[in-house]
Amino acid sequence: MAYVINICILYFLIISIQINKVQKKYETVFLCGYTMGTTWKVKIINNRHLTYYNLKKKIEKQLCYDNNQISSWNKNSDISNFNKNFTTKPQKINKNLAKLISIGLLVGKKTNNLLDITSGTLINIWGFGPTSRKHSIPSKKTIKLAQMLTGLNHIKLLINKQQYYLQKDIPKLQINLSTLGEGFAADNLKRILDDEGINDYYISIGGTVVTHTSPKNSQNKIIAIQKPTETDNEIHCLISLKNNAVSTSGTYRNYYTLHKKIIHIINPITGNPANTDLVSVTVISKSALKSDAWDTGLILLGFRQAKKISIQEKLAVCLIKKNKSTLFTWTSPQFKKFLIK
């Protein structure tokens, strides 16, 4: 998620290292930095000589490139240029951005259009977009006008001779990809590490984690899912991952209070912040992008529908529902395989 929901990563201690030196054989190395309004962290258990200074530069270059594609906060990003271009003609996009949008459209369709990447205007009027946070609740008229600029049926992803295009039929429609950004970036960092021949690592960007374990290493990565509270870092459950991605979305951290609690996840159907009984959703899959898309879509659906779709789609999901002060947890059969008893 673009809005940070921290996943506690056991033994992920951020230490100072001299990354300009070539590291010794079998050394564990930590790299970290900032991107997309959150932190990124990479832990590598390496069994060959590698210059980590160069690797960190590659990671930072990729993250900068991703930000220049998808960030609504970057006025010159590809998606910002699409939003500013008030035309209904097809606009060229690259293959990576097309893949990101295709996942958004797919999961959007499967979640009854609740995951809606065209909700940029709605997100802005509620103060969670690149514009300044507002200190007043938008009027019903403002919400209605924003909804008129929203809808997955108003965009098309086109392919012509291996060239990708994105088209909107409402000139002022605004795309916001913040719900998918961390997963998108994490998958791209995975590709970099794989290309470098690194086969034992994990990557963390905000609330999304990607793990890879060497065939020679029988130990899986142990990940702790946080209990959904506003302040405490208490562990809710532990999962064991080998070559997987996990993403968590929640309603308990990114919000502001104005007469009532205003959460960052906006329901495009009502035009208001989501009124959901779910406080946390965690999804495990092979793709960080897919996990990142599904966790937000499911939280918008609410417990009953999220459970139904998780079963239908055979998703590895942990749903945490709150009733007053009591938390109720449901895990799908696929998720149970990763749980540490």
Swiss-Prot record:
Residues 1-17 form the signal peptide. Its cofactor is Mg(2+). Keywords: Cell inner membrane, Cell membrane, FAD, Flavoprotein, Lipoprotein, Magnesium, Membrane, Metal-binding, Signal, Transferase. Gene3D superfamilies: ApbE-like domains. Its main location: membrane. It catalyses: L-threonyl-[protein] + FAD = FMN-L-threonyl-[protein] + AMP + H(+). It is a lipid-anchor. Its EC number is 2.7.1.180. The keyword Metal-binding applies. Flavin transferase that catalyzes the transfer of the FMN moiety of FAD and its covalent binding to the hydroxyl group of a threonine residue in a target flavoprotein such as NqrB and NqrC, two subunits of the NQR complex. This is FAD:protein FMN transferase. It comes from Buchnera aphidicola subsp. Baizongia pistaciae (strain Bp). The lineage of its organism: Bacteria, Pseudomonadati, Pseudomonadota, Gammaproteobacteria, Enterobacterales.
